[in-house]
């Protein structure tokens, strides 16, 4: 969105947090043009996705899976997890496991599916990188040690 509350992607995602209108509607948000509504809807959706992985994914890993699902969709992440298992990787760990399977799906994919996996992979990698950078800022690192939620 590049911080544009009126942004619309080629796939139809809208507003600051680039939600599909149908998804936002299912979460109870009809109008995403107000930044507050867009942010609230995006956070609620990410929280909902994180809950989808509650049973099998360790707590510290759930955010990465939820972010991939936010970008790609839950079924795409499940497909990558299944491939990770077939590749003898851990389907419940992101880095070096499902991440590798997603890269393989991006490499294999034809049509629109392959690039979507690649985009989701880059999306999660970018956020993980920023997260690492923010954690290294002394005041933020201190806040994290004092009980702020981790990944």
Residue ranges and their predicted role:
Residues 1-151:
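Catalytic glycan-binding domains that act on GlcNAc-containing polysaccharides
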């Amino acid at each position: 969105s590049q911080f544009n509350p009126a942004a619309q992607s080629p796939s139809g995602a809208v507003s600051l947090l680039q939600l599909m209108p149908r998804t936002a509607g299912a979460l109870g948000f009809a109008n995403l043009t107000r930044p507050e509504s867009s942010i609230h809807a995006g956070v609620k959706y990410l929280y909902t996705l994180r809950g989808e992985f509650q049973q099998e994914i360790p707590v510290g890993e759930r955010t990465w899976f939820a972010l991939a699902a936010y970008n790609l969709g839950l079924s795409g992440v499940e497909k990558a997890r299944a491939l990770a298992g077939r590749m003898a990787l851990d389907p419940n760990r992101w880095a070096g496991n499902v991440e590798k399977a997603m890269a393989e799906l991006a490499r294999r994919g034809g049509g629109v599916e392959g690039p979507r996996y690649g985009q989701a992979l880059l999306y999660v990698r970018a956020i993980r990188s920023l997260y690492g950078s923010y954690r290294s800022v002394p005041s933020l690192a201190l806040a994290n040690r004092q009980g702020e939620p981790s990944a």
